[in-house]
């Protein structure tokens, strides 16, 4: 498993037992269930103020607050009216090993979301130079360019992406890309974002990816969460597609304007804790320095 810093740690003990349990509701609608011994590493209002004031000139040393669920249920979750008191910071990027990939991650991500048909791509003027340079930097030759005034530019490359992926042309993101190193996954996400440049909303400094394919949008959500970003996923019933929204301080496209990362990307607030029926529980211990491990789809830190 992985700890809050994204490092792989070895599980040293697993025990099964039944216990009275609680369900913790988070601000992005995710939930975590566990018994009273489940621990969280939490931010308080004072911690968040100090994190906001931190300029990154020296190491941030303020510790997170360790609280068990049995203690949390007796504490107020709100203060000063309706403000939420406790929050769980997102984890750091998961540290997977570097992968030897058939197509560079940026190029694959761009191909995956942009291709009109075999070896035909379209690109807007806003990120034309950046994307073309990326292809050239990775050894591709731009073989055909059709510029249309006021519209997207159509281009082809050699060698073709399809020829490098033979014998299997994937219709979803292969696992070796999703389990690649941090730098490779950021490049993959950058390629996906640059494939359709209107996916970045500059006024709000956030990204929005839309798809009608459930498996595809879940893969991209897992990719984004694995580099330490919190996501929000919605289904628009009246137009039949899924929308994935998130913020990232990693530079994913040329026109992005985001502040640098100083401590972590973002956080989830605890909104409610409710009693639930007795359930089968699993006690886990690891050999990590702080005993933390990540759970659920959002890679949420527990202990």
Give the positions of each predicted feature.
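Intein-associated homing endonuclease modules of the LAGLIDADG/DOD-type, together
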Residues: 3-7, 12-243, 268-303
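Surface-exposed, non-catalytic interaction/assembly patches
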Residues: 250-277
């Amino acid at each position: 498993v992985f700890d809050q810093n994204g490092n792989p740690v070895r599980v040293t003990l697993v025990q099964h037992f039944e216990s009275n349990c609680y369900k913790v509701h988070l601000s992005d609608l995710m939930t975590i269930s566990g018994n009273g011994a489940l621990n969280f590493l939490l931010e308080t209002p004072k911690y968040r103020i100090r994190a906001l004031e931190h300029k990154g000139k020296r190491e941030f040393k303020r510790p997170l607050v360790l609280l068990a669920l049995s203690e949390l249920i007796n504490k107020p979750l709100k203060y000063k009216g309706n403000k939420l008191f406790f929050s769980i910071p997102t984890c750091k990027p998961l540290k997977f090993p570097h992968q030897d990939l058939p197509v560079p991650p940026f190029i694959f991500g761009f191909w995956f979301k942009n291709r009109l048909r075999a070896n035909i791509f379209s690109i807007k003027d806003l990120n034309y130079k950046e994307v073309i340079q990326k292809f050239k930097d990775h050894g591709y030759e731009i073989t055909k360019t059709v510029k249309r005034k006021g519209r997207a530019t159509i281009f082809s490359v050699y060698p073709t992406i399809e020829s490098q992926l033979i014998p299997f042309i994937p219709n979803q993101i292969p696992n070796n890309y999703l389990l690649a190193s941090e730098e490779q996954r950021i490049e993959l996400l950058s390629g996906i974002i640059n494939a359709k440049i209107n996916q970045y909303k500059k006024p709000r400094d956030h990204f929005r990816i839309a798809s009608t394919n459930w498996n595809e949008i879940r893969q991209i959500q897992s990719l984004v969460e694995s580099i330490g970003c919190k996501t929000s996923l919605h289904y628009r019933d009246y137009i039949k597609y899924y929308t994935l929204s998130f913020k990232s301080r990693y530079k994913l496209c040329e026109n992005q304007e985001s502040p640098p990362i100083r401590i972590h990307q973002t956080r989830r607030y605890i909104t409610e804790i409710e009693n639930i029926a007795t359930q089968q529980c699993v006690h886990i211990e690891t050999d990590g320095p702080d005993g933390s491990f990540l759970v659920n789809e959002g890679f949420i830190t527990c202990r």
